[in-house]
Design a protein with these regions (language model features):
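Conserved NAD+-utilizing ADP-ribose enzyme module
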Residues: 1-105
């Protein structure tokens, strides 16, 4: 498993409705009921994997860089885990953002 990103490091995520009422793209594993935000170590990995991710027709998406701690805060507030994926969609790390939030308080 890949190491967890540092709080201050950049990760890459898909954003829905960029520039407007934007939000991070979250997915759910229907079998386990786990909701997660896919994140990537590099923009290239994010773009390569995003091509194969489910999307809603008619919505705009964009890959954006975000500070890992900011992503963790939003994920925790909305009940999502963070999965660090590679370009093929393989899970490199599963992160519970509530553990990150707890360590920063």
């Amino acid at each position: 498993m890949e190491n967890q990103p540092e709080k201050e490091s950049w990760v890459y995520v898909a954003v829905e409705n960029p520039g407007g009422n934007e939000s991070f793209v979250g997915l759910a594993d229907e079998q386990s009921g786990i909701a997660y935000i896919p994140a990537f170590s590099t923009k290239d990995d994010a773009q390569a994997c995003f091509i194969n991710m489910p999307r809603e027709a008619g919505k705009k998406y964009e890959i954006q860089a975000v500070i890992f701690e900011d992503l963790a805060r939003d994920a925790a507030a909305n009940g999502f885990l963070i999965f660090i994926l590679d370009k093929d969609g393989k899970i490199n790390n599963k992160i519970d953002p509530t553990e990150i939030q707890g360590s920063s308080q």
